[in-house]
């Protein structure tokens, strides 16, 4: 199966007074065009659409709906993880992606295990989104409680922190919320063949077995050396 991943759009970001939305939008739509061009089976968003309290948040929400609509029209389902910048910490459990529930083809998974594809050609997906404090969960306990056939393909996608990783602008310049860590040891012990893909970090890299998608644009001056764009995998 062909999978395309895009993450950390931060469509409301401003760098030294310069609104970056147009650049973010261009990068996002490049990932969508690529997904359609290769006839991708699934499109994943790895979290951090925008902060919920900014006056510019509506544009990011509009962009998310546009992406979901275009992908659905091309027959490509999209799965959207909530990131630490998306959550609304008012006790309601809300987030910036909530309205996508009305978009055809768009799914926002809770912490859960599900399958994508057909009964003959499918992958198991384990989603580890960031959640508001009112809906917090223990990622280690969640992984240890799963029963998935290790002979079938498993993808774990999350928007969590990685212990020991070199902090980048997502931590130093754009911090938000609490730290919730990837259960990498638990995943490796229970599902040794699982492929792990993560959002949250803006620099594309692989750390502790997790393939970081990276942001769709260089959001701060410290990200000038980053490779931005989207990630493609075939499983």
What are these regions (language model features)?
Residues 35-39, 74, 146-152, 232-234:
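Glycine-rich phosphate-binding loop signature in dinucleotide/nucleotide-binding domains
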Residues 9, 13-118, 187-193:
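Core catalytic region of metal-dependent phosphoesterases/phosphodiesterases
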Residues 8, 47-48, 83-84, 159, ...:
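Active-site glycine-centered loops adjacent to acidic/histidine catalytic or metal-binding residues
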Residues 42, 77-79, 153-155, 194-195, ...:
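Proline-centered loop/turn at the N-terminus of a beta-strand
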Residues 115-117, 124, 232-234:
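Short, well-ordered beta-strand micro-motif
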Residues 163, 168-234:
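Conserved beta-sheet core of the metallophosphoesterase superfamily
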Residues 1-4:
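Extreme N-terminal starter segment of soluble prokaryotic enzymes
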Residues 119-186:
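Binuclear metal-dependent hydrolase catalytic cores centered on His/Asp/Glu-rich metal-binding motifs
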């Amino acid at each position: 199966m062909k999978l395309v991943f895009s993450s950390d759009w931060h469509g409301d970001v401003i760098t030294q007074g310069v609104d970056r939305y147009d650049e973010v939008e261009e990068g996002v739509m490049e990932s969508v065009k690529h997904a359609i061009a290769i006839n991708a089976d699934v499109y994943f968003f790895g979290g951090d659409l925008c902060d919920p309290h900014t006056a510019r948040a509506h544009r990011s929400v509009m962009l998310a709906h546009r992406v979901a609509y275009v992908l659905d029209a091309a027959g490509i389902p999209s799965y959207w993880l909530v990131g630490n910048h998306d959550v609304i910490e008012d006790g309601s459990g809300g987030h910036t992606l909530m309205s996508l529930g009305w978009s055809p083809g768009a799914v926002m998974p809770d912490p859960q295990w599900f399958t994508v594809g057909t009964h003959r050609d499918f992958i198991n997906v384990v989603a580890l989104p960031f959640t508001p404090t009112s809906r917090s969960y223990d990622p280690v306990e969640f992984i240890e409680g799963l029963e998935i056939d290790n002979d079938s393909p498993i993808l774990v996608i999350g928007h969590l922190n990685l212990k020991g990783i070199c902090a980048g602008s997502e931590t130093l310049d754009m911090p938000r919320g609490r730290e919730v860590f990837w259960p990498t040891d638990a995943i490796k012990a229970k599902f040794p063949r699982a492929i792990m893909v993560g959002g949250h970090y803006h620099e594309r890299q692989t750390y502790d077995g997790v393939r970081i998608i990276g942001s769709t644009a260089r959001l701060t001056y410290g990200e000038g050396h980053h490779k931005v764009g989207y990630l493609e995998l075939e499983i």
